[in-house]
Amino acid sequence: MLEQARRRLAGLNAKLRHHDMLYHGLDAPEVTDHQYDLLVQEKKRLLDEFPDIRQYDDYADVVGTPKIDSRFPKVQHLEPMLSLENAFTVQDVEKFITRVRRFLELQPDDILELSCELKMDGMSFSALYHGGKLTRVATRGNGHFGEDITTNAMVLRGLPHQLDSAPEVLEVRGEIYMHHEDFEKLRGSCNFANPRNAAAGSIRQLNQKIVEERNLSYVAYSAVNSTFATQQEILKQLDEWGFHTNKQVLFTDKIEEAIAFYNSVYTTRSALGYDIDGVVYKVNSINFQKLLGATGKSPRWAIAHKFPSTEARTKLLDITVQVGRTGVVTPIAELEPINIGGVMVSRASLHNLNEIERKDVRIGDLVIVKRAGEVIPQVVDVDKTLRSSGTQKFVFPSHCPSCGSKLHREPGEVALRCVAELSCKAQALERVKHFVSRDGLNIMGLGAKQIEFFCNHGLIGSIADIFSLEEKLHGINLDTEHGWGEKSVANLIAAIRNSATVRLSNFIFALGIRFIGVGAAKLIAEHYRSYKNWHQAMLALTETHDTVQIRGLGEKSISSLKAFFSVQGNLEVLESLSAKLNILDEASPAQRGSSAISGKTVVFTGTLESMSRTEAKLQAESLGAKVANSVSANTWLLVAGSNPGSKHEKALSLNVRVIDEQTWVKMVEDARS
């Protein structure tokens, strides 16, 4: 179950990255906010149910992704524009109320009033007023920074440009959307999938006249930096200032009334003339809101009760299998394409062999497919009443479809997996992505597309091949390939060279061993201190029935280490890597905490003779220091090599201590002794 959850988490993160890039980076979202939020909600439920997989979460606390190559200036919000936590059932709402009451330490007879408001399916914005005058309008962006769309927002119907008796600084938030009628008029000339996409794309037009012609609407729902006592007062004042507000709102202290409001809205929403995707419940008291605060990405005082997911029936054309990074072999339903909730679906998850057998899924069946925040949709049922005699039972392969290794099922697990790990080509692509990730070797410029390119062209077959790439590229002219140029190739080679010096904990994590996330890798590295010690201990572990004790590490992690070192192909890759990398020793927690530079800011400048800049940086960080790229008043130490440049002059002017490379080496040795 844990491996399934980890695989699901990786898929959810991949999907979230994909949609964040489409929405925030390319202005071309494929899904609605509703569909995106379902992905976020499923991820939250998954992490709540399997807390042990949090260490594998490489896309945490995400609100959005900064827009690339933006045509609009980036601006900062007064306070972060966080996304809302989602509820899909009455039980979810009840749990939210319970959490809020517990957090506020309310007694059973204490009143907790809610504001129940429609959740618009549009694009969030903030409007900033100084002295009552509208000075800036911005998109939500990544929650902290958004795009300045002031010029275009000036033509939004009914958006006040001047407020009477407003606070000196006020930030009003709301949603830009498009009515169905206006969307239908637009559909003939523009290729937008739905009103939400049309609103998001229209407000980002470079031509203000086009924005005005699109007839966009908005609704305001909150005010930041205000002195109001309740959300009810905020909505009333927004209305008096002339903002468009949604009049379909309920204030109640009874959860039954809130749910009844939700049900009423759900059944009558088609008559609204615009899209909504749920009801938002907010704690009405602003004082309570301030006490509740927020998590990394969601306020604790609000939740979005989302409308049910959609299902559809289609034909199962075939069942294929795919091998993931950790070797799990997953069956995939190949479907007759069907439109579910505005998205064309042609593939769906069948989860595992047990699920196929339990549901008696056969090729040729009519299956029920559900989209409810899945990475890919899932097959939830089979319509056996229409089963024909020509359907076929699926035979799950006994060997890996990629490398031919015999598939293995571990006790207590339902997933079949290929245990070849580092030597299985199907796993190579995802393993290389993991290897170069931020918490691994952190190779900038070697992203998913570049890795896929090199794998498809036979230049990378395993993680060790990364460090032979420079040699292989000598005989290849990448300038003729799309997306490559002389500068990008040079930058990639430089990044690979820099990554050849790596801290032991990062190296262990980068290998992608099952159950060894960032935290576990650090525990292992701190226990053995050097690559040589760790390698020898693991080889000894495979030759005995004994086990090892590493503080904080569980049985599954130890067993996984033993299994990893029992595969000859893995040992060969390790031998190749250790010959090409400079794997730095890991400092103990005691060393980091007690070192003279712990918590201090260090800057390096000039050319170092005995080590690379990367190695020096890792040395400093391993001893608890913060490494900065520039000198400031907060800099504690400047390490100057030959030809130090302007940083040296600035350090002297700020009375920052300056030492040479030899003194730095001695300082590191003393800290580690």
Curated annotation (Swiss-Prot):
Domain BRCT: 592-673
Keywords for this protein: DNA damage, DNA repair, DNA replication, Ligase, Magnesium, Manganese, Metal-binding, NAD, Zinc
Function according to Swiss-Prot or TrEMBL: DNA ligase that catalyzes the formation of phosphodiester linkages between 5'-phosphoryl and 3'-hydroxyl groups in double-stranded DNA using NAD as a coenzyme and as the energy source for the reaction. It is essential for DNA replication and repair of damaged DNA.
Domain of life: Bacteria
Enzyme Commission identifier(s): 6.5.1.2
InterPro entries registered for this protein in UniProt: BRCT_dom, BRCT_dom_sf, DisA/LigA_HHH, DNA_ligase, DNA_ligase_AS, DNAligase_adenylation, DNAligase_N, NA-bd_OB-fold
UniProt name for this protein: DNA ligase
One Gene Ontology cellular component annotation held by this UniProt entry: cytosol
Binding site for Zn(2+): C400, C403, C418, C424
Cofactor(s), names only, from the UniProt record: Mg(2+); Mn(2+)
GO BP term, pick one: DNA replication
Cystine pairs: none
Active site per database record: K119 (n6-amp-lysine intermediate)
NCBIfam families referenced in this protein's UniProt entry, alphabetically: dnlj, PRK07956.1
Natural source organism: Anaplasma marginale (strain Florida)
Any GO molecular function: metal ion binding
Residues holding NAD(+): D33, H34, Q35, Y36, D37, S83, L84, E117, R140, E175, K282, K306
This protein's record includes keyword DNA repair: yes
Gene3D superfamilies: 5' to 3' exonuclease, C-terminal subdomain (1.10.150.20), 6.20.10.30, BRCT domain (3.40.50.10190), DNA ligase/mRNA capping enzyme (3.30.470.30), Helix hairpin bin (1.10.287.610), Nucleic acid-binding proteins (2.40.50.140)
Family: Belongs to the NAD-dependent DNA ligase family. LigA subfamily.
